[in-house]
From Swiss-Prot:
Enzyme Commission number, as recorded: 3.4.21.88
Catalytic activity: Hydrolysis of Ala-|-Gly bond in repressor LexA
Site residues, Cleavage: 91-92
Enzyme class: hydrolase
DNA-binding span(s): 28-48
Species in which this protein is naturally found: Latilactobacillus sakei subsp. sakei (strain 23K) (Lactobacillus sakei subsp. sakei)
Name under which the protein is recorded: LexA repressor
Annotated GO MF terms: DNA binding; serine-type endopeptidase activity
Recorded family membership: Belongs to the peptidase S24 family.
InterPro entries membership: ArsR-like_HTH, LexA, LexA-like, LexA/Signal_pep-like_sf, LexA_DNA-bd_dom, LexA_repressor, Peptidase_S24_LexA, Peptidase_S24_S26A/B/C
Pfam families per record: LexA_DNA_bind, Peptidase_S24
S-S bonds: none
Keywords: Autocatalytic cleavage, DNA damage, DNA repair, DNA replication, DNA-binding, Hydrolase, Repressor, SOS response, Transcription, Transcription regulation
Amino acid sequence: MTKTESKQLEVLRFIHERVQDKGYPPTVREICEAVNLSSTSTVHGHLARLEKKGLLQKDPTKPRAIELTPAGLTAIGATPQKIPVLGVVTAGVPILAVEEATDYFPLPPSLQTEQDLFMLTIRGESMINAGILDGDEVIIRKQSTADNGDIVIAMTAEDEATCKRFFKEADHYRLQPENDTFEPIILNEVSILGKVVGLYRDRM
């Protein structure tokens, strides 16, 4: 291992430890001080190379939004937590829910501290205005309640599951699609399976 590669592993470990400890990644200056680098530009160079290697990923829309990929976690000897993929749920006409794990998905580091998570594959286009597309996989936190406006996985009285935005109104519940071509689902009773807290899209 070269000196540069060794330093990059130090950077990865520090980012991972900070996210585990604080719940958010360090600043570039904090990385600089923690791994004894001479300048922030050197840190930026390491981060760019780590991202190119597929060991780190950044969200360009958010400041400091950097996290280790599953490959990055493997590189530092950390085992990524995995969550069950429980099949398909519809963003359209409700379909029967089947709670059997079809696969296990490595959890993004930003959600490693979360409990009781599972994943479902979306079928349909009723949530496209919320950025949830056909074929996307959504990460759901198990919970039986929701606030107005939350995107949830809900069960209807017929034991059918659907992904919609939740609203409790005067004498009913409204499961609102995010696509103007779909009608809302109005129910007297609804069972919440969980709240959508993340999304994964295969870009291949």
